[in-house]
């Protein structure tokens, strides 16, 4: 990869630091007394403090300078006076190291004394300075004016997602989003642990990808010589644990689905799954709305959150609407008692394309997804799904054509899916067999039959309610994000294609002196192929001009030397 001029200069500074006896990447622990946020809160003049962080700006003014360092909590101002930092004869730490060899982006550690400037700014007078890490690539120079307007923003989505490490440094709002994500998960853990439920881990590699209707990723286990699947859900394993005697289990599950990518879908995502014995879906609705209210309180300090200009109120109770009523209200179609042919005709009548692989469940799902879903902005439980849509759900206690299932819709998006869990092993086997028939018709999202899970149910599972909550989508809503990529540290992207980098040895093989090699690279001639078609005189003139401009302490090139390089290449 060709180095920029700034990168070349930083590498020269790196070498100069070492020449001064300063290790730019020390191994020793550096102990701090404060971070920026705590220091600002506890600040008073005359405190002895030790801070560490990344240099974000410098204002050099001769014998005195200001700098700003950034740590995990924020930024803090430093004041460096040459004679305070270097009280003895040797002023190199200030005059050379700080002023010339350090750059924006470098990590330093400092010790000093707090004081307030004449303009009222909290600052630290630096008495000691330690280089902790030299940055070899310059950070984007994002600027914020007095009115809060951002200039030269690091805003390109592809660059931000590929280089999240840079995004986090220069865009504070991004860091706040992921801190909110952490609060969401902490709040859930506190609630569930307080209820006495057990956090567990279940397999990611599975012989049968059960628990959901989705297309799995397939891999191969060489030692066992069998196909394995990345999990699409952990539901069936958690139910096995309920069979085993745990009354409440939960897991933050990393799931994988080999399907499309858009603003709400990533092939790898996080779902919270909870299963509690002796409960039903009515209890789970109440538990869910109370949990989400607590989560919003933890993130925002209240039960309301702004999402694209719409105020979402997470305070319970949430509206409850049956699937039948939702479709009837928004399409005029009554799904009750309809055959597959009638549902197919109804879909086509309202402009939904169908194919022969779609059974009753898929047709109803399309009706709701295409025509109804977007109407539910405030938190709403869509409940009582047709039995064809819910192969793992207990039949409704009052109507066997429906199931005791709900999905939580917020801002037109599904956030949670929950059931009164099916615990009748014979009924479950029949549901799996119905799914197998759909698979044979070409539905690649139909569920597999998991014989071991059926065996587990035959040992007896108590009445149980379970829920899956999409953590990524929930965080999107709580942080006012419109893309799932904004709430994933490293969203899935096509692999980046890197160039091969500089070939200094290849240049030296042509006869380029070792002293000249990095400067050819810095000038853009980073590989032997880059010299093809160049005239000896033109290359000599360019490189000697480069030597003069950068005041390089190496002999000027002769025409004969350059001719030798090019003839060796050609």
What are these regions (language model features)?
Residues 1-500:
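Class II aminoacyl-tRNA synthetase catalytic cores and aaRS-like
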Residues 496-570:
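Compact, charge-rich alpha-helical regulatory domains located at protein termini
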